[in-house]
């Protein structure tokens, strides 16, 4: 409970900070985020940027779009949110965009056309668009008839303007029932819209036709909704998920390449010598149960107040590291050379230098399915969300 209370305080403090930053920007004062060399806020900010807001409730998203994304999530992650190794999604983020509005009108008797507008969010440098598809129902079954439908790009004063035949269909495993079609429109989105600045809207036409010989129905799409029959899928990859490690200084690199374990052995030898040096007792290492180790911890998104926009998973197991770092850092802790030297300095030179702390060493990602403020549904893999092992550094 204490950890949960502390986490809540930190989260609300971050929210207040972000609101203050927005207010400062609105009155013309520079925010901290725009100052040079300002450190980026942690991952929690990225999560909060996707949230609808404290006062907004979860947008009502039902029907096939939600079912599609839930199935995509279940195929890509397990019940705890861990990404599956055999996932075939081909991206670290998928956004389902529903049309903002539609203009429907009967045309040429048996033809029925809807014009659909899909808003495209501003580009983010960290994410690269790798695929774009439109999903629609190619068969609409009504009370007294049925319609055959297709999607085409909207072009002013053009009765028909089909997508290139090479763009039809999808090479990925389909999550769709037989009455639905997924069509690749990456070329159209990439060339026409994606690199444009300012407000961008993808406009498509949903065209349906009644079978020949059937009674012409004069209706305005009663009983059907384009919000549930057509949606856009945008696939992204995180370009910053794999960060290159900085090279070691030339001297240290040559030293470690000759004998990588030499520095570690010397540090251990110095540690054993330090035990014979007169000084304050270092018996605070304590019993083995107090040694630095990984501790399980689980919290629900409902406890964090995020369940109004996070669909899955329901529980989050971040884990945490706790315990005393030993006086001699053994190999299993994976401590960096700096921590080993710092430990020696604390033992032999200056006891005011703090000993290394017990912190997470390795993390694993978590997949989250959430609803954005505009009603879009987002699947996203967040790196560094679950601590898997600990180290002293």
UniProtKB/Swiss-Prot annotation:
One of its GO terms (molecular function) is growth factor activity. Its main location: secreted. Glycans are attached at residues 86, 237, 374. It is found in: Secreted. InterPro entries: Cystine-knot_cytokine, TGF-b_C, TGF-beta-rel, TGFb_CS. Residues 26-268 form a propeptide. The keyword Disulfide bond applies. GO terms for cellular component: extracellular space. Disulfide bonds join 292-358, 321-390, 325-392. It comes from the Eukaryota. Keywords: Cytokine, Disulfide bond, Glycoprotein, Growth factor, Secreted, Signal. PROSITE patterns: TGF_BETA_1, TGF_BETA_2. Residues 1-25 form the signal peptide. Pfam families: TGF_beta. May be involved in follicular development. Oocyte-specific growth/differentiation factor that stimulates folliculogenesis and granulosa cell (GC) growth. Belongs to the TGF-beta family. Homodimer. But, in contrast to other members of this family, cannot be disulfide-linked. This is Bone morphogenetic protein 15. The lineage of its organism: Eukaryota, Metazoa, Chordata, Craniata, Vertebrata.
